[in-house]
Structures are given as C-alpha cells and as structure tokens.
A protein has these predicted regions:
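Transmembrane helix boundary and interhelical loop/hinge segments in multi-pass membrane proteins
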Residues: 42, 94-112, 127
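Long, hydrophobic alpha-helical segments
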Residues: 81-101
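Selective transmembrane-helix segments that form parts of the transport pathway or gating/packing helices
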Residues: 118-145
Length: 247
C-alpha cells in the first residue's frame, strides 16, 4: 500500500522523464506527459471532479425551478436560457480550471516540472486537460439543461460549434491565469476577479451565438469573433507562458 502512494514530485518527474525522450516528437510527448499526469491525479482523487459536476448539477436544478415550465413564458425564455447556460458553464469551469497550476504548488511538484520541461509545454499540457474537462462538463450540462428547462435548439450543429470554440478560449485564458495566481494568497477569489473581465467579450458572443443557434439564425459573426478571440488568447498565452510559469 505504501509502495503505491509515491510522492507527487516523484510521480511527476517519472512521467515527464519517461515520455520526454529526445526526438522529433519530444515536444508533443512532453505536453502529453503533463496532460496524463493531471488526468491520473484527478482520477485518483475524484474529489475535485465530483465538486465540479456537483456544482453544475445543483445550478441546473435551481435554474430549472426559476425559469422552467412553471416560470417564464416560452417566448421569453430563449435569451435568459442562453445567458444562464454560459453562466453555468463558466462557474462550473471556474470551480475546476484554476487548480491547473495551483495543484502543482500545493503538492510540491512545480519545481520538478520547471526542471524537466518548459513553461510553454506545461501550459499546453494543462490546457489540453482542462479543455477535455470543459467538454465533459458541457456534455453533461447541456443535455440536462435542455431537458430540465425544455430548451429547444433549432440548429444543434451550430450550437456545438459555438460551445467547442468558446470552450477553447475559456480554457486557454483560464489555464494561463491559473499560472499567474498559483502562488497568490486568495487564489480562487483572485482568479474570478481577474478572469471575468478578460472572458466577458468571449462570453457575450458565446451567448449571442447560442441564442442565434436556438432561433436558427445566423451565427457567422459570433463564430468569427470567437475564433479571433481564441487565436489572440492562444498566441498571448504562448508568448507569456514562460514568464507566468517561471515567476
């Protein structure tokens, strides 16, 4: 039993060294090693993942009573539903995404990662894991939202595109900000205070695109803006990753 409970630092170093051997694909292997490490840690604990999904389920239940079949009239629900969906997705993600780098500081594995790989690759690996987590949250929350609130989407394919693209921007920014607040005192509060203004433009166009998909209207403008935001956020995170991770 004691043999299996290796320290987090040893576990982190062994994974990165094993998968980061020199070669043409070494960068991809290093980023994937970080993703695998985070996934293994979360699956082993399950507490953080359970908290994220429990928050999403609780929010869905409360919202369904407020504006569901016994609340607002059907013709008045669409704008409120689009906004509430992204509020639920944002705060559900904010429950788990900030722990990307905070976890390394708390478990003492940050120093090991700094020694064996670059900040860009650490950020890439953690962003990939967080993006997978966001998609899992969306895959659970959106069907539940549609059932509990009797939400009808006229263009489901467009909705999926909006969620996938906006989810990447939300994840990229959140993961980068997690590196900035990892060593702060009030990490969770600081993360929400910093992230909301930066994510507000993305969330506004995500809500706009979701509403358009609900009404089978054009989503081209929303998708273009979200793509531009994703590109800018990804480039900024790439350029500043080393500074955020090392400092």
């Amino acid at each position: 039993m004691r043999r299996n409970e290796a320290s987090p630092g040893v576990h982190t170093s062994s994974i990165v060294y094993r998968l980061a051997s020199p070669g043409p694909w070494s960068h991809i292997r290093r980023a994937w090693a970080v993703t695998s490490k985070d996934a293994a840690q979360e699956l082993r604990r399950r507490v953080a993942l359970a908290a994220v999904f429990f928050f999403a389920a609780t929010a869905l239940a409360l919202v369904s009573y407020a504006i569901g079949p016994f609340g607002l009239r059907p013709e008045d629900r669409a704008p409120v539903q689009a906004a509430l969906l992204w509020i639920i997705l944002f705060f559900s993600a904010a429950t788990g995404l900030p722990r990307a780098f905070v976890r390394e500081e708390e478990t003492g594995t940050a120093l090991a990662l700094r020694k064996v790989t670059s900040g860009v690759l650490v950020l890439a690996g953690k962003t990939l894991f967080n993006y997978t987590l966001f998609l899992a949250i969306a895959a659970v929350a959106i069907p539940g939202f549609a059932i509990l609130l009797e939400w009808n989407v006229s263009a489901p394919v467009q909705l999926v595109v909006i969620v996938v693209l906006a989810g990447w921007g939300l994840t990229a920014v959140s993961t980068f900000l997690s590196a900035l607040v990892a060593q702060a005192g009030q990490k969770n509060v600081l993360f929400v205070v910093i992230s909301f203004p930066m994510l507000l433009p993305l969330l506004l166009f995500a809500i706009s695109g979701t509403l358009a998909a609900t009404r089978s209207e054009g989503t081209t403008t929303a998708i273009q803006v979200i793509l531009a935001y994703d590109g800018a956020a990804t480039c900024a995170a790439y350029l500043l990753a080393e500074v955020a991770w090392e400092e």
